[in-house]
């Protein structure tokens, strides 16, 4: 089990018991200053600074006692934001019709970066479909190969 999975299993039930939505987490390891960033949201969308402080105050002692991460790190609790990262296929499904930027772990059809309108999510094949920005082609990206999928806000 990865470090991210261990932390998720430890903290997700706490965040959800407080009435918040666990959106996901990122762990950026660095020998000088690692960051554990936890994204939370509300049913209504948007989370306030008071909520972030409350969640942080609940999670810090648990992390101190359980120590799922043994190196020094900074805990950040954050809103997913308008340009939110999509961590799961279920999250992707909520944003069908949105513009998404995907960076893959390995090249797919000769490219690692794709941007387009998300048109479908296939849970059986574990893929997301994008109509590319030029509108000329549709690609079906294997979700397990996506390093990061992020919403591109339209203003």
Curated annotation (Swiss-Prot):
Primary subcellular site in the record, as a coarse category: cytoplasm
Keyword entries, A-Z: Cytoplasm, Ribosome biogenesis
Keyword Cytoplasm attributed: yes
Pfam families given in the database record: DUF150_C (PF17384), RimP_N (PF02576)
GO terms for cellular component: cytosol
Gene Ontology BP annotations: ribosomal small subunit assembly; translation
Annotated function: Required for maturation of 30S ribosomal subunits.
Name of this chain's protein: Ribosome maturation factor RimP
Organism: Dichelobacter nodosus (strain VCS1703A)
Name of the encoding gene: rimP
């Amino acid at each position: 089990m990865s470090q991210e999975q261990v932390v998720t299993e430890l903290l997700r039930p706490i965040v959800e018991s407080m009435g918040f939505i666990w959106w996901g987490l990122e762990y950026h390891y660095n020998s000088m200053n690692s960051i554990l960033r936890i994204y939370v949201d509300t049913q209504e969308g948007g989370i306030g600074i008071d909520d972030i402080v409350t969640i942080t105050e609940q999670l810090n002692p648990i992390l101190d006692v359980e120590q799922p991460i043994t190196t020094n790190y900074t805990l950040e609790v954050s809103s997913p934001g308008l340009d939110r990262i999509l961590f799961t296929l279920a999250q992707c499904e909520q944003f069908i019709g949105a513009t998404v930027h995907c960076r893959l772990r390995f090249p797919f059809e000769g490219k690692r970066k794709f941007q387009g309108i998300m048109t479908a999510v296939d849970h059986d094949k574990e893929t997301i479909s994008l109509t590319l920005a030029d509108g000329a082609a549709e690609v079906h990206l294997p979700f397990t190969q996506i390093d990061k999928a992020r919403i591109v806000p339209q203003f």
